[in-house]
């Protein structure tokens, strides 16, 4: 026992990214050697994702309310530059996807059953859904994980608490510290959770089904990689005039890896919050910008909508001029910002974009169905890009405001 305990302590003290990599390797090995057992191990992944999703709504609500309630008058929260970075990044992603689709055009064989979910009829419906989510019942918003509604009520409560006594404000600060401590414990189980997710995915789905869509996946993943490694660093450099790559790789490693396997921006909010705290960012900023980013910062979704829409266009033999392609970029960017307000996310916004080219809903929904088939990779990569960019742009805005000469990466531990 005396020998086992130090080993356990050493394992717990190992960098969590290394632990996650070990979990990934172990998951692949288990799925290869014992597929049935690997499917059962998926329980660990489901528990981990459920725990993250359970703690995320209350974490966002308490942190945002406490942050706004305790904000001093005239204090700069850096939210405006963060939002600008979110919108610019999403539009650049959509433009990149258009260029990649023109350089490497994709056609599809539409011989599968159409997806059965109902897609939104237009951009007005998407905006309408988002507006109604803002005024959702606060209890229902917390229960259903409606982060737009949670943000709205948390901001309203925080503003209302401006005139409260210091003792009342202190209660919310203490509550936010308690919730943050719970999140820290949940995140420590990430290696086990990701082990379960990888085991289940490899054992149940495999990647043989993806071979037929290799070109489509290459365009999607290539576009996302270009945004993550070229465009986003360029945006950060223009904003800060400092080397962006240490921060880029940190965000991809510590936020993107977890998001890739959880496939949920909402579930990754606690992970991003913890990373922002390690980077010593302003709590007033990241407590709002991270959950907001999970809602509107959707570079990956913009790429998915654009690439699959142009694949449908190529398949239907429709000619696309430059003006229409630019319009598609704008529609995809705006639609992507509303992806969190649509059941099925970015995929079910594809028919909306296809309507620009007169493509029938039947064909568009078959493209959506292909999206679900490749979702094991597409959705994972999309979420990793979306979620890691939340931390990237939040850090860039905070560092620019703090000191323009300090390096971007300054973790406290």
Curated annotation (Swiss-Prot):
Name of the featured protein: Serine/threonine transporter SstT
Domain of life: Bacteria
Gene Ontology MF terms in the entry: neutral L-amino acid:sodium symporter activity
UniProt keywords, alphabetically: Amino-acid transport, Cell inner membrane, Cell membrane, Membrane, Symport, Transmembrane, Transmembrane helix, Transport
Protein's cellular compartments: Cell inner membrane
Swiss-Prot/TrEMBL GO biological process terms: serine transport; threonine transport
Main subcellular localisation: membrane
PANTHER family assigned: PROTON/GLUTAMATE-ASPARTATE SYMPORTER (PTHR42865), SERINE_THREONINE TRANSPORTER SSTT (PTHR42865:SF8)
Keyword Cell inner membrane part of the UniProt annotation: yes
Lineage, highest ranks first: Bacteria, Pseudomonadati, Pseudomonadota, Gammaproteobacteria, Vibrionales
Free-text function comment from the UniProt entry: Involved in the import of serine and threonine into the cell, with the concomitant import of sodium (symport system).
Entry-linked SUPFAM superfamilies: Proton glutamate symport protein
Gene: sstT
Transmembrane segments annotated in the record for this chain: 15-35, 48-68, 82-102, 141-161, 178-198, 216-236, 290-310, 330-350, 357-377
One Gene Ontology cellular component annotation held by this UniProt entry: plasma membrane
Assigned protein family: Belongs to the dicarboxylate/amino acid:cation symporter (DAACS) (TC 2.A.23) family.
Keyword Cell membrane assigned: yes
Membrane topology: Multi-pass membrane protein
Pfam family, one: SDF
Catalytic activity of the protein: L-serine(in) + Na(+)(in) = L-serine(out) + Na(+)(out); L-threonine(in) + Na(+)(in) = L-threonine(out) + Na(+)(out)
């Amino acid at each position: 026992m005396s020998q086992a305990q130090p080993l356990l302590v050493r394992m717990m003290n190992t960098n969590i990214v290394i632990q996650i990599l070990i979990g990934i390797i172990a998951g692949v090995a288990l799925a290869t050697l014992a597929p049935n057992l690997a499917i059962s191990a998926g329980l660990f992944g489901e528990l981990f994702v459920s725990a993250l999703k359970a703690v995320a709504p209350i974490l966002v609500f308490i942190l945002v309310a406490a942050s706004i309630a305790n904000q001093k008058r005239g204090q700069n929260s850096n939210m405006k530059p963060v939002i600008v970075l979110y919108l610019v990044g999403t539009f650049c992603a959509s433009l990149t996807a258009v260029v990649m689709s023109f350089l490497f055009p994709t056609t599809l064989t539409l011989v599968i059953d159409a997806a059965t979910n109902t897609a939104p009829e237009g951009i007005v419906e998407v905006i309408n859904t988002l507006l109604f989510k803002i005024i959702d019942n606060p209890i229902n918003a917390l229960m259903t994980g409606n982060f737009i509604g949670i943000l709205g009520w948390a901001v309203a409560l925080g503003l209302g608490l401006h005139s409260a006594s210091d003792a009342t404000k202190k209660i919310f600060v203490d509550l936010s510290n308690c919730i943050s401590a719970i999140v820290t414990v949940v995140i420590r189980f990430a290696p086990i959770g990701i082990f379960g997710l990888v085991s289940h995915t490899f054992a149940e789905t495999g990647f043989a089904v993806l071979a037929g869509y290799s070109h489509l996946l290459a365009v999607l993943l290539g576009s996302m990689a270009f945004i993550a490694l070229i465009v986003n660093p360029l945006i950060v450099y223009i904003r800060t005039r400092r080397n962006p790559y240490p921060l880029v790789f940190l965000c991809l490693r510590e936020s993107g890896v977890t998001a890739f396997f959880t496939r949920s921006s909402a579930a990754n909010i606690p992970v991003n919050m913890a990373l922002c705290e390690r980077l010593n960012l302003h709590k007033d900023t990241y407590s709002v910008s991270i959950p907001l980013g999970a809602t509107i910062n959707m570079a990956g979704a913009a790429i998915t909508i654009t690439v699959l829409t142009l694949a449908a266009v190529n398949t239907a033999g429709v000619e696309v001029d430059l003006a229409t392609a630019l319009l598609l970029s704008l529609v995809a960017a705006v639609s992507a910002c509303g992806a969190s307000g649509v059941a099925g996310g970015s995929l079910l916004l594809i028919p909306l974009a296809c309507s620009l080219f007169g493509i029938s809903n039947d064909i568009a929904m078959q493209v959506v169905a292909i999206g679900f088939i490749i979702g094991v990779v597409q959705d994972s990569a999309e979420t990793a890009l979306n979620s890691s960019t939340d931390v990237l742009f939040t850090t860039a805005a905070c560092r620019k405001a703090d000191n323009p000469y300090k390096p971007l990466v300054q973790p406290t531990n």
